């Protein structure tokens, strides 16, 4: 029973990151590429570079699309959400990933081109780690842990 638990654990912790990176390609963002166009309230569209507009409300949904080769890394998007939360502490931001689509609904616009000198946005200067690198490190750590439990 212990062996079956080890095998299923290995399959789980190796398979999930591989499937995740298959459907969501792991690419780092160009964090200094700030160009974006907003088309009205509730709809934000731009080129396939770094998204530098975030629209949030007190109960907003943020849809990210990390499927394109030049799309921002998920870690970078989380930094954007964190910066928006620090800028607007009363807003509740719901983050959701979907395979094909990038849509932000809201009435509070965070323009990084104008506000990137704000101290909260200095977080964005940090390099965005690709999801694949994080997944590989996580899988290696879990493999070591499972090996210790199974064979030591």
Swiss-Prot record:
Q: Which InterPro entries match?
A: Equine_arteritis_virus_Gp4 (IPR004257)
Q: Which domain of life is it from?
A: Viruses
Q: What is its main location?
A: virion
Record's signal peptide: 1-21
**GO CC field:** extracellular region; host cell endoplasmic reticulum membrane; host cell Golgi membrane; membrane; viral envelope; virion membrane
Which locations, inside or outside the cell, does it occupy? Virion membrane; Host endoplasmic reticulum membrane; Host Golgi apparatus membrane; Secreted
Task: Look up and give the membrane topology term.
Answer: Single-pass type I membrane protein
Q: Where on this protein are sugars attached? A: 33, 55, 90
Outline which residue ranges sit on the Virion surface face: 22-120
TM spans (from-to): 121-141
- GO BP: clathrin-dependent endocytosis of virus by host cell; virion attachment to host cell
Q: Tell whether Cell cycle is among the UniProt keywords.
A: no
Topology, Intravirion side: 142-152
Keyword list, A-Z: Clathrin-mediated endocytosis of virus by host, Disulfide bond, Glycoprotein, Host endoplasmic reticulum, Host Golgi apparatus, Host membrane, Host-virus interaction, Membrane, Secreted, Signal, Transmembrane, Transmembrane helix, Viral attachment to host cell, Viral envelope protein, Viral penetration into host cytoplasm, Virion, Virus endocytosis by host, Virus entry into host cell
Q: What does this protein do?
A: Minor envelope protein. Part of the glycoproteins heterotrimer GP2b-GP3-GP4 which is probably responsible for the attachment to target host cell. This attachment induces virion internalization predominantly through clathrin-dependent endocytosis.
Family as reported in the entry's similarity comment: Belongs to the arteriviridae GP4 protein family.
Q: How does it assemble?
A: Heterotrimer of GP2b, GP3, and GP4; disulfide-linked. The GP2b-GP3-GP4 complex associates with the E protein. Interacts with glycoprotein 5.
The name this protein goes by in its record: Glycoprotein 4
What organism is recorded for this protein? Equine arteritis virus (strain Bucyrus)
* Phylogenetic lineage: Viruses, Riboviria, Orthornavirae, Pisuviricota, Pisoniviricetes
Gene of origin? GP4
């Amino acid at each position: 029973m212990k062996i079956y638990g080890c095998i299923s654990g290995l399959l789980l912790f190796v398979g999930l990151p591989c499937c995740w990176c298959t459907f969501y390609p792991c690419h780092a963002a160009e964090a200094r590429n700030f160009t974006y166009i907003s088309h009205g309230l509730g709809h934000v569209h731009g080129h396939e570079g770094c998204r530098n507009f975030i629209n949030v409300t007190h109960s907003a949904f943020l849809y990210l699309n990390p499927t394109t080769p030049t799309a921002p890394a998920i870690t970078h998007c989380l930094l954007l959400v964190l910066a928006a939360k620090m800028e607007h502490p009363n807003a509740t931001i719901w983050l959701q990933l979907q395979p094909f689509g990038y849509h932000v609904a809201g009435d509070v616009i965070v323009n990084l081109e104008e506000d990137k000198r704000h101290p909260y946005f200095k977080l964005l200067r940090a390099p965005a780690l690709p999801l694949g690198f994080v997944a590989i490190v996580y899988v290696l750590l879990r493999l070591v842990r499972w090996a210790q439990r199974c064979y030591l």
